[in-house]
């Protein structure tokens, strides 16, 4: 008799994805982040569902309803802070997952990579709209500033912004629709993640060497299920520590002040995970130019397969490219720092230089370094 997991139509899908899946024997802990992201998404959907049971998307009561969740709902404070800090963990895993893809050349699986970039956009949109919901000062002004960027689009810009707002300013209509979108988008993300996995399983996983691993596969279970559980425990430990010891560490104190359209906060800034893109946006004096740079800073990831000039897939044996990769990481950390600073000297010029370096590294220096390494191979 054949095992039910190999014959049952539903169990067969699970079996081929998580149990009998042939996986390379040498993938490192950098390959843990896919499962961690899945875990983060499930956590966010569950905590979000329980928050939505108590939240009201009305400008008069939104702030009070969040306060009510934290004060009066059983373990409401825990659910709220797990959701808020869970988003931070989600983005940490996302950035590490993308970084892994860049380092080891995983972007050569083009369908998987491009759907991954779409996933990144979708998660960023979800996080932005979620940040608006508590209706604090930073929620309101963040929504105003970011949606206003669309007015830079020629001809239709102003109409588009007013259409998104549902009026002539960020108000009740905006909050209600943002809540609706914030609820539906995670399910779209989950569907996209399914397609992401579908395309990944067409080709099989990449591995640190960047070479074909067809001749040396091992079953996903038990080897990588155990390995993923270790990653999951570390993630849970980190999230629990953050939530229980310092839940407001990554938040903005201004968001504990109810939204007031008549009072602008001294420094409007998004959550930490958007600061690098915000710094790129601010470093260009022209509004439309800034918006284009902002979008292109993420969209440039889609060009990675076209910019790959090396004869080797992975950076494992390419020291010049490795140096440039870590320079890119340092540059992104610099941009993140600058995004949280006021618009004054010397931060403006540092931000502009870091933005130029970001695009120069990706579009010019890394492809040239790969060509140089190809040439060095001949010696």
Curated annotation (Swiss-Prot):
The chain crosses the membrane at residues 33-53, 77-98, 113-133, 178-198, 226-246, 288-308, 320-340, 347-367. GO terms for cellular component: mitochondrial inner membrane; respiratory chain complex III. PROSITE patterns: CYTB_CTER, CYTB_NTER. Disulfide bonds: none annotated. Pfam families: Cytochrom_B_C (PF00032), Cytochrome_B (PF00033). Binds 2 heme b groups non-covalently. One of its GO terms (biological process) is mitochondrial electron transport, ubiquinol to cytochrome c. InterPro entries: Cyt_b/b6_C (IPR005798), Cyt_b/b6_C_sf (IPR036150), Cyt_b/b6_N (IPR005797), Cytb/b6-like_sf (IPR027387), Cytochrome_b (IPR030689), Cytochrome_b_C_euk/bac (IPR048260), Cytochrome_b_N_euk/bac (IPR048259), Di-haem_cyt_TM (IPR016174). It is a multi-pass membrane protein. This is Cytochrome b. It comes from Scapanus orarius. The lineage of its organism: Eukaryota, Metazoa, Chordata, Craniata, Vertebrata.
């Amino acid at each position: 008799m054949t095992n039910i997991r190999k014959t049952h139509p539903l169990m067969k899908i699970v079996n081929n994805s998580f149990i009998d899946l042939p996986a390379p024997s040498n993938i490192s802990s950098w390959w843990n982040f896919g499962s961690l992201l899945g875990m983060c998404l499930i956590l966010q959907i569950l905590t979000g569902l329980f928050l939505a049971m108590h939240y009201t998307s009305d400008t008069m009561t939104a702030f009070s309803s969040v306060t009510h969740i934290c004060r009066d709902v059983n373990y409401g404070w825990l659910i709220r802070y797990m959701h808020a800090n869970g988003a931070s963990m989600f983005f940490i895993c996302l950035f590490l997952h993308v970084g892994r893809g860049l380092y080891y050349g995983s972007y050569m699986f083009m369908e998987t990579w491009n759907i991954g970039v779409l996933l990144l956009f979708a998660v960023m949109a979800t996080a932005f709209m979620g940040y608006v919901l508590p209706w604090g000062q930073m929620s309101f002004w963040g929504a105003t500033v970011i949606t206003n960027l669309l007015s830079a689009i020629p001809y239709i810009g102003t109409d588009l912004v007013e259409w998104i707002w549902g009026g002539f300013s960020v108000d009740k209509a905006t909050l209600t629709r943002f809540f609706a979108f914030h609820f539906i988008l995670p399910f779209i993300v989950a569907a996209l993640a399914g397609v992401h996995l579908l395309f990944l399983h067409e080709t099989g996983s990449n591995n640190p060497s960047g070479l074909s691993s067809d001749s040396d596969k091992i079953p996903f279970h038990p080897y990588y299920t155990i390995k993923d559980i270790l990653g999951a425990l570390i993630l849970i430990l980190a999230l629990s520590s953050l939530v229980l010891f310092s839940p407001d560490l990554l938040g903005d104190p201004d968001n504990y002040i109810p939204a007031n359209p008549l009072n602008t906060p001294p420094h409007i800034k998004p959550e930490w995970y958007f600061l690098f893109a915000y710094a790129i946006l601010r470093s260009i004096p022209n509004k439309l130019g800034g918006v284009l740079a902002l979008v292109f800073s993420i969209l440039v990831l889609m060009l990675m397969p076209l910019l790959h000039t090396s004869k080797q897939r992975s950076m494992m044996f390419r020291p010049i490219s490795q140096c440039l990769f870590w320079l890119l990481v340092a540059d992104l950390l610099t941009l993140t720092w600058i995004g949280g600073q006021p618009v004054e000297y010397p931060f403006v010029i540092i931000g502009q230089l870091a933005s130029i370096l970001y695009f120069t590294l990706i579009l010019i220096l890394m492809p040239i370094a790969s060509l140089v390494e190809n040439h060095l191979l001949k010696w």
